[in-house]
Amino acid sequence: VANGMEAAHKHHIVHRDIKPQNIIISKEGKVKVTDFGIAKAATSSTINSSAAMGSVHYMSPEQARGGYSDERSDIYSFGITLYEMLTGKVPFDGDTTVAVAVQHIQDAIPAPSEIAEDVPLSVDKIVLKCTQKKTERRYQTVSDLIADLKKSLVMPEEDFVKIAPMYAQ
């Protein structure tokens, strides 16, 4: 999935709706990201939207506010998708789409290991870094995310994922 996002981002395309329903596995076992229906071509500036775009359970805080989207919005949605893959549930749920959107904007995401205790430390921190509220605290590129995912395969319990302090701009 991250490799598919990386390919899209290299072509300056922001998906804006990364979620399990938009991930398919071919008969050959290849994972593909689908449904670029609300994708936008990214330019040197960010994408502005007057309406929130994406599926609310996987939506980044900036999308929930109806604001700008860039590659880091896809990274957030990937983090939510990974969270669900690891725990079997999304971190935020509610009776209305607005209630879920507000949680994406305001509430901290619990570490996946709080739900599924067998999640390794490095994977916990990868998910938490992907899902930071401020874009500046997330992975800045999918390439950086992929590097940490690969490292987590060989050093799952190592504490190598660095998350910027809360006061970072």
Task: Give the location of each predicted region.
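Protein kinase catalytic-loop region centered on the HRD/HxD motif
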Residues: 1-13
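Residue immediately N-terminal to the catalytic "proton-acceptor" Asp
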Residues: 16
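Conserved protein-kinase catalytic-loop position immediately C-terminal to the HRD catalytic Asp
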Residues: 21, 34
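Activation-loop N-terminal segment of eukaryotic-like protein kinases
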Residues: 25-29
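Regulatory activation segment
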Residues: 31, 44-53
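C-terminal lobe helix-coil module of Hanks-type protein kinase domains
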Residues: 55-160
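Regulatory extensions appended to serine/threonine kinase catalytic cores
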Residues: 159-169
